[in-house]
């Protein structure tokens, strides 16, 4: 039997197991307690708990009968609004199992539907409102038409704060017999950008190769540049060894397939940890922003990164000059 994805294995099953989202949990608990609930719209970036919360709500509403009373659909997977209509019609025509007053339809990626399809969805929601409630999941609320928004209680889901993600990752690692270093958690958080699903997946891939997970193991697992490579590039360039720095950069680009934008992100991450004064860090950050902008405008990656390394050499020269004792007159 194939091993479960850790994200599914450790998916919360109750409100108490959900980390963060206290205000959302409080309001949903009231719906469960009263037995009366409007249609819901959960929106926010990927991996922020929208699907998890919808499934937790289903479990809290229906207990052991949650599967029988819940229909999960994905707007991207279905072959049009007519398929969704027929599936909802078939699902809604039977009474809820147990003592539940209504059934539940969870529609993921609702914001990927066209405006016409959403208008049709609005009518479906109205037709079956007597015994069916909808939970719509979306990344962007701005892509949902107003007539649907006005019929829903709207909940915003935000990326998980670092300290809460760290707690969860440490718990999962300990449960799996894996030691995860603090610098590894830092990099996982930066790479996942608060996406809990992505963070857990990175941890699982990293743990598959090494039971002691540090920053470099994470970088390899996520196909990111190793921090040690970036530090080496920084040091070579700052020391004025431009040719070696450029050779290292070209190796990473053409042998390991690192893209220009990935270089920029990796430099930005490691810059914070460099033992440079704040003024120098600000100068390098401004230089990175300049190169990043040019890359987004279609400039040649190798030329722009070579320019960046050359400018680092000039910055390093200024640092060394400033550290020399003043000449005696």
Swiss-Prot record:
- Classify the source by domain of life: Archaea
What CDD domains does the record point to?
A: AAA, HLD_clamp_RFC
Record flagged with keyword Coiled coil: no
Which keywords annotate this record?
A: ATP-binding, DNA replication, Nucleotide-binding
Q: Does the keyword ATP-binding apply?
A: yes
The record's section on SMART domains has: AAA
Residue stretches spanning the membrane: none
Give coiled-coil spans as residue ranges: none
A Gene Ontology biological process annotation? Answer: DNA repair
| Self-association and partners | Heteromultimer composed of small subunits (RfcS) and large subunits (RfcL).
Give the family from UniProt: Belongs to the activator 1 small subunits family. RfcS subfamily.
Q: What is this protein called?
A: Replication factor C small subunit 1
Q: Which organism is it from?
A: Pyrobaculum islandicum (strain DSM 4184 / JCM 9189 / GEO3)
Q: What is the lineage of its organism?
A: Archaea, Thermoproteota, Thermoprotei, Thermoproteales, Thermoproteaceae
Q: What is the gene name?
A: rfcS1
């Amino acid at each position: 039997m194939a091993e479960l994805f850790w994200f599914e294995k450790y998916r919360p099953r109750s409100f108490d197991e959900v980390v963060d989202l206290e205000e959302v949990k409080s309001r949903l608990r009231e719906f469960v307690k009263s037995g009366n609930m409007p249609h819901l719209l959960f929106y926010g970036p990927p991996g922020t708990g929208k699907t998890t919360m919808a499934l937790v709500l289903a479990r809290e509403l229906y207990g052991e009968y949650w599967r029988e009373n819940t229909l999960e659909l994905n707007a991207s997977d279905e072959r049009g609004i007519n398929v969704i209509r027929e599936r909802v019609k078939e699902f809604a025509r039977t009474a809820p199992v147990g003592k539940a007053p209504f059934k539940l339809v969870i529609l993921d990626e609702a914001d990927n539907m066209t405006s016409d399809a959403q208008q049709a969805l609005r009518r479906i929601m109205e037709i079956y409102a007597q015994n069916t409630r909808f939970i719509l999941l979306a990344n962007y609320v701005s892509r949902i038409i107003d007539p649907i928004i006005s019929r829903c209680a709207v909940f915003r889901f935000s990326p998980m704060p670092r300290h809460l993600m760290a707690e969860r990752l440490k718990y999962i690692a300990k449960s799996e017999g894996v030691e995860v270093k603090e610098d590894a958690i830092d990099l996982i958080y930066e790479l996942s950008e608060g996406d809990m699903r992505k963070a857990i997946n990175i941890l699982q891939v990293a743990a598959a190769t090494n039971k002691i997970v540090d920053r470099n193991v994470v970088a390899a697992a996520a196909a990111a540049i190793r921090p040690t490579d970036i530090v080496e590039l920084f040091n070579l360039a700052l020391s004025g060894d431009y040719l070696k720095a450029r050779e290292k950069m070209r190796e990473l680009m053409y042998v390991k397939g690192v893209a220009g934008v990935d270089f920029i992100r990796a430099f930005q991450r490691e810059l914070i940890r460099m033992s440079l004064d704040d003024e120098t860090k600000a100068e390098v950050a401004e230089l990175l922003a300049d190169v990043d902008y040019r890359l987004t405008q279609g400039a040649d990656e190798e030329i722009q990164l070579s320019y960046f390394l050359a400018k680092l050499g000039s910055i390093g020269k200024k640092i060394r000059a400033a550290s020399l004792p003043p000449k005696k007159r």
